[in-house]
Amino acid sequence: ILIKESSRDTLATALSVTVDPADGLVIGVVLWSGGSGVEFVGCTEITNDSGQSDVFYSDDTGYPVDSRTSTNPDNSSYLLFNVPAGGPYMFTGDTDGETTEADAPMVFAEAMTFVYLIYDEATWATNPTPGGCS
């Protein structure tokens, strides 16, 4: 998905990030999928093998901020700028020691790639968000 340069730059400026136009943007969400539908998973730390370690997690309004160190239980989305074009890249979510993975087969320059990390009911009977997560 292509993203308007002005939209990308507005987000980057708000987060004090300098955008490299040769790189891409990755956005995603961490979910638990069960019989009753899907739920956000909070307190998940995202890592990946792209070389980009600056992950921005959403606040209660769904806007990415630089003050969170893991996903918000009320909006578990995340954002990475300057992910090198290429791939494939593996993204890992770690929720209190419970991990799940998803791959991004390709990241394109000046484009947005979505990566959904799913904890499924077959492996996790309940949402793995730890108690006390905020």
Give the ranges of each region predicted by the language model.
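Short, acidic Ser/Thr/Gly-rich low-complexity loop/linker segments typical of extracellular
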Residues: S50-L79, P105-V107
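Short, ordered, surface-exposed loop/turn motifs in non-cytosolic proteins
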Residues: G24-V26, W32-V65
